[in-house]
Amino acid sequence: MSVPVRYSSAAAEYAAEVDCELESTLQQQQQLHLQQQYEQYQHYQYQREQDIAYYCQLQAARQQEQLMQQRTSMSSSVMPGLALPQDHQDHPAALLNGPHNNNIGLAMDAHSINAILVDDEQPSTSAQAAAAAAASAGGSAGAGSGSGLGGAIGGGKLANGINRNAEMPTDWMRIADEGRYGTPGAAGLEYQKYEQQQQLEDLAESEAGAVGGASNNNGESSSSLKKLEDQLHALTSDELYETLKEYDVLQDKFHTVLLLPKESRREVTAGGRDGSAYVLRCLKMWYELPSDVLFSAMSLVDRFLDRMAVKPKHMACMSVASFHLAIKQLDLKPIPAEDLVTISQCGCTAGDLERMAGVIANKLGVQMGHAPITSVSYLRIYYALFRNLAKEIGGDFFKFYQQLIKLEELENRLEILMCDVKTTVITPSTLALVLICLHLDFHIKESYTRGSPELKHVFEYILFLQQYMRIPDRVFTCGFSIVSGILSHYNGQNKAPYKQRLVWKLSSRTLRVLRPINRFSSDLPTIEEGIPNALDDGLRSRTESISSEEEEDWPTSPIIPIFEQC
C-alpha cells in the first residue's frame, strides 16, 4: 500500500523541523555549558585574587605585630585574627569565605592593637596631676612659685600629649621612621644590636687576655674625674657659654616633673622612688662608677615613671634595669646582669632585667653612646666658669677656690639632692646653679668678711648667670628653698659610713634540706663577775653592730622596706 504524496511530504517537513529544534536545543545546551564553565573560571580567578590579597594583608599584619613586639620588647602571643589557617588551600569553603574572614580578622586586629596602645600609652597619675597643675596655673595668676613651675612644665606635657588618636598604620610608619632618630619605635632593634656588639667585644677582650670585671671600673673612676677636670680647665669661658646653650636646648628632653603620691597601693609613691634612688647610689658606690651613671639612670627612672603606669611591685626591676641600661648608654664596662640582680636583691632574674632594659630603651628612645643632659652636666660647666672667674680675680681668692671648692664634693651633694623627688620640679640648670651658689656661700662665710671686694664680683657673676640661663627670680628662690631644706636635713643627721647588710633569702625547700650544725658558730668565753673585761672593744667581730640595729635614714636592705611593701 502506497502512502499519499501529501502525507509523505508533511512527515518529511515535520521530521526536518524536529531535527532543527533538536539541533538548536543541543547548541543552546552547549552554549549554556560553556557559559557556566566561563563563569566558574572567572569565579575561580576572583577567589584566587581575593586569597592573594588576603595573604598579603596577613603578612602586613604580621609585620605590624612584629613592630609592636619590638616597640614593647615583650613576647606576646600571635592574635587569633592574624593566624593563617592551615587548611587554607585544602578546603574550598575556606576560599569562598576568605573575604568575610578577612574583614573579621582585620576588625579583631584593629581592636586588639587599639587596646594595647591605649594600655601602653595610658598616662600615669603623676602625668594627670601635672596636667591639672598646668590648668590651675593657667587659671590663677597669683599661684606660688613652686606650683607655677610645675604647672608650666606639666602644661607642656599636656600640649605634647594632643593628637594621640592618629591613624594606626600612619602611626606605625611614623614610629618606624623616627625610631632611628631617638624617638620610641626602633630603639629596641638598636638595643639588640648594641647587645650583640657588646658580646662580641667582650669575647674579643677575653680572648686577648684583658682583665675584666669591676677592677677596670675601679681603676678608671679616679682617673676619669681627673681627666674631666683637666678638660674643663682647658676650655675658655666662651666655649663654656656655647656648651651651656647646647645643653639648654636639650635639657627638656631628659627632664620631667614627677608628682607622686605619698601613699598609694596602685602607684609608685614618692618614698618608693627615693628609696630606689638610694639603692642605685649604693650600687654606684659599690662598683665605683662615675656620677654620670647614677644621674642617667635616675633620668630614665623618672621619665619612665612619668610616661608609664608602673606598679609598685615592678619598681625594683625597673630601677635596676635603668641602672644597667645607663652603664651601656655611657659606653662603660658592662656589669653582668646576674651580678646586679644578686647585689641589688631586686627579686627578679637576669632575663627579666634584660627584657625590662629593652622595654625602657624602646619606650624612651634611648640612643647608645649618647650621654643625656642632666644636672651634673650643668654643674661641671658652672664649676669651670667660676674657676675662670676666680682665676681672673686672682690673689687669695683663686687659692681659696682651688682648696675648698671641689668638684667631687659638689657631685656628691648633687647626688643627695637627686635622691629626693622634690628636686624634679626644678630644671637641671637651675638645680646646679643653686647648689654651687649655696656651696660658695657656705665657704665664703667662713673665709671672708662681708665687705670683701672679691665678693662683689662673685655676686654680680651669679646674677649674670641667672639672666644668661633665663631663670626667673621666683623660680630661683623656690629652688633655693628646696635645696637648702634638703641639705639642712641631710647635714643635721648623724653621718654614718655607707653600709648595706646582705640578706640571704632561702626558700622553704632549702630550709628543709639544711641541717643545724655547730661548725659555723664559735663559743665565747664566759665573763666572770668582778674581773675586768680582757677583751678590747676594738676586737669585736661586728663593726658598728649597735648602729646597724637602729633605724637609719634609708633601709639596710633595699628590697624589704622598699619593694616588698606592695
UniProtKB/Swiss-Prot annotation:
GO cellular component, one term: nucleus
Cellular localization per UniProt: Chromosome
Location of the Cyclin N-terminal domain: 285-368
Main location (coarse class): nucleus
This protein's record includes keyword Transmembrane: no
GO terms for MF: cyclin-dependent protein serine/threonine kinase regulator activity; DNA binding; protein phosphatase inhibitor activity
Keywords associated with the record: Cell cycle, Cell division, Chromosome, Cyclin, Developmental protein, DNA damage, DNA repair, DNA-binding, Growth regulation, Meiosis, Transcription, Transcription regulation
Lineage top rank: taxon: Eukaryota
Pfam family, one: Cyclin_N
Membrane-traversing stretches: none
GO terms under biological process: cell division; double-strand break repair; epithelium development; female meiotic nuclear division; G1/S transition of mitotic cell cycle; meiotic DNA repair synthesis; negative regulation of G1/S transition of mitotic cell cycle; negative regulation of Notch signaling pathway
Coiled-coil boundaries: none
Disruption phenotype annotation: Viable but females are sterile and produce eggs with a ventralized phenotype where the dorsal respiratory appendages are fused. Reduced levels of grk protein in the oocyte cytoplasm and very low levels in follicle cells and in the extracellular space separating the oocyte from the follicular epithelium but no effect on grk transcription. Increased incidence of DNA double-strand breaks in mutant germaria.
Entry keyword annotation includes Repressor: no
Family named by the database record: Belongs to the cyclin family. Cyclin G subfamily.
Functional description taken from the UniProt entry: Cyclin with roles in multiple processes including transcription, meiotic recombination repair, cell cycle regulation, and promotion of normal growth and metabolism. Binds to the promoter region of the homeobox gene Abd-B and is involved in maintaining Abd-B expression in the pupal epithelium. Involved in the transcriptional repression of the homeotic genes Scr and Ubx.
Subunit relationships: Interacts with corto. Interacts with the cyclin-dependent kinases Cdk2 and Cdk4. Interacts with Brca2 and Rad9. Interacts with polycomb protein Asx. Interacts with protein phosphatase 2A subunit wdb.
Protein's name in the database: Cyclin G
Organism: Drosophila melanogaster
Lineage of producing organism: Eukaryota, Metazoa, Ecdysozoa, Arthropoda, Hexapoda
